[in-house]
């Protein structure tokens, strides 16, 4: 294996962060969150990957605002009530010297159609061919709010 991938198990520096190897786990939806909160099942899932030697884990979809949800089992991080679960998850992964980062996400027109959800938003009022109804074009003001939500 080293003949073809001589640097795979070597550390790599990304900005100011050093990752122990070049084995990265991409975001893969598990739908194991409970109303956006990290569950014990999620902690076990990600810590098992860290224990197996992954250098960097990118979590699954993590919503940054409360109105639109991609799938009901997705994780969230739009207010401080989510911090204890995230801390438990991060601590579990860090015990194996694995780095972890959240895939911050807003579903826009792909949001799950939960009753009471307002009309879906998108960059324009043209949605995908499979959508039951067209989204509403996001306003400049809403875009500023979304940018702030990603930053918080």
Provide a role label for each language-model segment:
Residues 1-152:
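Flavin-dependent oxidoreductase catalytic cores
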């Amino acid at each position: 294996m080293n003949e073809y991938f001589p640097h795979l198990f070597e550390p790599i520096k990304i900005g100011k962060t050093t990752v122990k190897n070049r084995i990265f786990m991409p975001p893969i939806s598990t739908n194991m969150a409970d109303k956006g909160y990290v569950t014990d099942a999620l902690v076990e899932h990600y810590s098992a990957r860290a224990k197996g030697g992954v250098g960097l884990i990118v979590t699954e979809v993590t919503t940054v605002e409360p109105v639109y949800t991609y799938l009901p089992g997705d994780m969230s991080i739009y207010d401080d009530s989510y911090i204890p679960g995230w801390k438990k998850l991060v601590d579990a992964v860090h015990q194996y010297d694995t780095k972890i980062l959240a895939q911050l996400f807003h579903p826009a027109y792909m949001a799950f159609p939960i009753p009471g959800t307002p009309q879906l938003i998108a960059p324009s009022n043209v949605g995908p061919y499979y959508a039951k109804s067209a989204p509403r074009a996001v306003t400049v003001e809403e875009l500023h709010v979304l940018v702030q939500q990603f930053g918080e």
